[in-house]
Amino acid sequence: MVNFDEEVFRAYYEHKIKSFIKEELSNNLIKGNIFEFDIEKFLMHFPDACEVNDLIIERPKEIEEIILDIFKEAYVELFGEDKELEKIQIAFKNPKGCEKLIEEISAEDINKLVKFEGNILQAGKVNALLKKAVYYCNKRIKDENGGFLCKYTYTPCDGRVEIEIDDYFSEGEFIKDMLSPREVKKILENKKVWDKLVEKGKIPRCVDLKENDEVFKENLKEIKFILDEYDSIYVNIQEMEIQQPIDLMKNPEEPARSIRVFLENTPGIYAGRVNVIGRVMKREYRHNIPIYKIYIKSNYIKISESYNKIEVKDILRNEELIETLNELGRKKNIIDILSNYLISQIKGYELVKKAIFLQQIKGAFKFLPDGTPLRRDSHILLITDPGIGKSTMLRRIARLFPQNAYASVTTATGGGLTAIVTREATEIGDGWVVKPGVFVRANEGTACIDELTVDKNVMKYILEAMESQTIHVNKGGINVKLPARCAVLAACNPKRGRFDRNLTVIEQIDIPAPLLSRFDLIFPLMDKPNRKSDEEIAEHILNTHIETATKDYKILGAIDIDGITVDEKLLKYYIIYARSCAYIEENQDLYLGEFDETKLIMPYLTDKAKKMIKKYYLEMRKLGEGDNPIPITARQLEAIIRIAEMHAKARLSDKVEDVDAEVAISIIDDCLKQVAYDPETGTLDLDKIAGTPKSRRDKMDAVLNIIREIVSLRDDGLAPEEEIYEKAMAIGLSEKDVNDALEYLKKAGDIYNPRYGFWGLL
């Protein structure tokens, strides 16, 4: 414990602290009712004041009170008196030496300042906290000058008592609307501020009774201190539970530890990875037993810089690393090589690997005139036979970056994937809390969703997340919009568990059309026996098992690309570099502070690439003229542009050239041919993905027209089923076509079946 003497502290540091505060105030560096005392910045001004940092960590409460007093003095000296000064609070920013993991916060940290990082596991609604209770004596009277006198002694006395609420649980229970003088004294003594207030003359005589104060003793029962709602100070407070991120766990196999945080002066924060600076507090856990729960009291919390931004700063500070990455980017077929290395556990499926690799790089930041961001993420769906390795791919990508997240629909709920508002017991009583799901946790990353088709109820939750990249929750007085700007990498098996070669791919995808159409790329991965590929896969699996059994596995896990050793770390650096900072203009130092990805130079479409994409789009659209099915829509055009941008960034180029457009078109074209091909017409039909192919719609229209024709000629307004079949087969429809059409038209509400063998129009 650092020794502390307030007088000595003030003698050494008061003038320095006041000088620093005045400079900050002159630059208008105050946020609402919070003044952020930036310790790092203070020490840059006064390098010989390192002890201030140590004292803030060891005795945050006492130092906070002193700095608040100094702040008020500095403010008055600069701007004069201001009633709003009473509402000001001090928040410590950038302390050094108190960084901890959540799992490291223990009993020895009680009453000390700590700094830690974590994910918001759940967050309650914002409530009002009585921060400073102001009481006035009911026996004070006004004098002729507008001041106050004691009713019994007629001596000046404003009868005011201020009680700061520091420990919500031990002090809050004594705060009532009305207190007796004895209760006031007991509270102030328990808070250990009695002597200081007596010394300053801020205790009314009826509270600080002397032996000769008979007049007060006689009337003590009549004297009450009434809580003044107008002069008392209330602040926002939010209770949240923050969990240690897996990437910061000493042992990722153990359950992640979490801690309760009470955040003051907050408008409300419900999701994200956050940095917290606060004081470790305790509250009674078992009545009459000295066992306590630990919680954090904080008024400083900040959304953490994403892993992406942190790594960008590391890259920008390392010229040698930048040179290596740029050299890698110039290598021939570098995208194919890194794509295979990214998912090296699986043999083959090069196009799928490339698409997933590009997905991690993301497209360019672009905004509409009203400021609405355009989606830069690519959504990918893998539909695979068993044994292909879809779960392996998803888990590999989920482990790639901290903001990537994995979930399997077999064990997840819709709310667990998006977000839920639920009623739970909290430290301050039962209340509604927001629990962010996988899509929110994967903000700025990739949400890897396995076994997508296991639970159909989950799919309706996923649709909004993919469509708007936000999650809306509105329940229990909580109405928030949570960010879910993530790419989606989903996987499932075909409807019957394995692909049926007698059916088209789209007929075997058990996903609602609105959700299916949100995927930019849909890859059917079939397990087709082939001697050559089977031999390669067997060799690959055997070699992998041999390598992982050796002591030099980590060395063997790296690959050599023309003299450059690429391991997992360098692969991540390359993706981050391509994603964010390959195109930073002249002064890189500008981005070492508050790094903003949206201000980076992003690749632009060259005329050649633009013409190539436009030509492909128009040629495909032309195939859909007349009664032909539509092979492509504007949604696929946007997907092509995104993928072309990703490919250009993967080459570390600031231009989307014809090679990028060619790759993007080939990937989209390959997916369309596998998924949207209609064997009946021999054409690509996007309506197959949307739900009903044109060929099927034409058959249903034909059956409906037949029913209309028959009904118009009959008095009972009903069409016999036999006659419907007879006329339908006459124009080339099969019995199955008619059965399917009747079933669909009935579900759609176009026809009804009043009695067996007859159909009528609705």
From Swiss-Prot:
Entry keyword set: ATP-binding, Cell cycle, DNA replication, DNA-binding, Nucleotide-binding, Transcription, Transcription regulation
Gene Ontology annotations for the cellular component aspect, listed alphabetically: MCM complex
| GO molecular function terms attached to this record | ATP binding; single-stranded DNA binding
Gene3D superfamilies given in the database record:
P-loop containing nucleotide triphosphate hydrolases, Winged helix-like DNA-binding domain superfamily/Winged helix DNA-binding domain
Q: Kindly list any coiled-coil regions of this protein.
A: none
One Gene Ontology biological process = DNA replication
Keyword Nucleotide-binding on entry: yes
Detail which positions bind ATP. T384, D385, P386, G387, I388, G389, K390, S391
The reply on keyword rRNA-binding is no
MCM domain mapped to chain residues: 334-542
Q: Which PANTHER family match?
A: DNA REPLICATION LICENSING FACTOR MCM FAMILY MEMBER (PTHR11630), DNA REPLICATION LICENSING FACTOR MCM4 (PTHR11630:SF66)
Q: Which family does it belong to?
A: Belongs to the MCM family.
Protein name in UniProt: Uncharacterized MCM-type protein MJ0961
